[in-house]
Design a protein with these regions (language model features):
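Internal intein/HINT superfamily modules and their associated LAGLIDADG
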Residues: 2-189
């Protein structure tokens, strides 16, 4: 789930295996450390944290922030054969590709991490202020159309969750209505 969300793989100079790296803003520092404690427990590797300054590159999404400097926390696991193995499944020509094989590797905690990295729970209210629906959106705009279709099919075939691809600027996001959002949340609790 981490690689589907806010983590990436990095191959260091003269390295044989890939390193897993995540970046989050200071508000998500505790969440970042929690994710890496899971990895440390399961992979037996230590990690290190660094505080960096980055420049906002998302000109198309947030034009007012282009070029602004901001603080990020970066955590690196170090190289590991498992990271290299998953990268071979997930990347084609150095681009993330979400295959059915990759999706079968997801666990409920992996889904939860992906949701916490790239998901959103929205509420719609009636005129009187009462909540009438809860909807989940999973931001999958960074994946190609085939990957997006694979994700929709995975949720339907595995959990009987009917997700829909909704237009978002020049791409699509996965949207779940109230019924399907409840199913999803029951899996990732």
């Amino acid at each position: 789930g981490m690689l589907l969300g806010d983590c990436s793989t990095v191959l260091g100079k003269n390295a044989v295996n890939y390193n897993l790296k995540c970046k989050h803003n200071p508000k998500q520092y505790d969440y970042l450390i929690w994710k890496y404690d899971i990895l440390k427990e399961n992979l037996g590797k230590n990690y290190w944290v660094s505080k960096t300054k980055s420049h906002f590159a998302g000109k198309a999404l947030h034009p007012g922030n282009a070029g602004k400097e901001y603080v990020m926390y970066s955590v690196s696991l170090g190289t590991h054969t498992l990271v290299t193995h998953i990268r071979k499944i997930m990347y084609i020509n150095n681009k993330k590709f979400v295959s059915p094989r990759l999706l079968k590797l997801l666990t409920p905690i992996g889904l939860a991490i992906w949701y916490m990295d790239d998901g959103c729970l929205s509420y719609r209210k009636n005129k009187d202020g009462t909540i009438c629906s809860r909807e989940i959106t999973l931001n999958i705009q960074g994946f190609d159309n085939i990957s997006q279709e694979n994700i929709v099919k995975y949720f339907k075939d595995t959990f009987d969750i009917d997700g829909r691809l909704h237009k978002d600027r020049d791409n699509r996001r996965l949207w779940m209505n109230t019924t399907n959002s409840k199913k999803f949340l029951s899996i990732v609790k």
